[in-house]
Amino acid sequence: MIITFCGHSNCLFSDEEKEKLKQLLIKEIRKNPTFKFYLGGYGDFDILCLRTLRELKTDFREIELLFITPYIDKNYSKLEFAKYHYDDVIFPPLESVPRKFAILKRNEWMVEEADLVIAYIKYSWGGAAKTLEYAKRKKKHIVNIAK
């Protein structure tokens, strides 16, 4: 089972929203302790998800935290960070995608692979909102913790 995330890159979270995310993740992990979590590593919501999952990994060691990179470039700065904060790095099949579309196509790939999309979407514009709309078109199970 795979869970992925989409959320606004710049936002502040209430303690209630942070706890809501944590409790949702615990509930899902208890259903299937071998979940894989696909994370994009961009913005505030991705950072919150990574921090929460790393905290939960102390109790649920079987979960995998996977950084899904939009770029194959070995000099991509986030790859070095990913080596220390994720269990592995995945390069989706994006070799033929122009660099300016790589993040969008990576997000779509993550949605296609996922069984559940956990979102933090408060408004209808931007890349995160586009990813959420894509997940809806693909009829993915979605939980938006911003509501």
Question: Model features per residue range: what roles?
Answer:
Residues 1-147:
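Acidic/glycine-enriched connector segments
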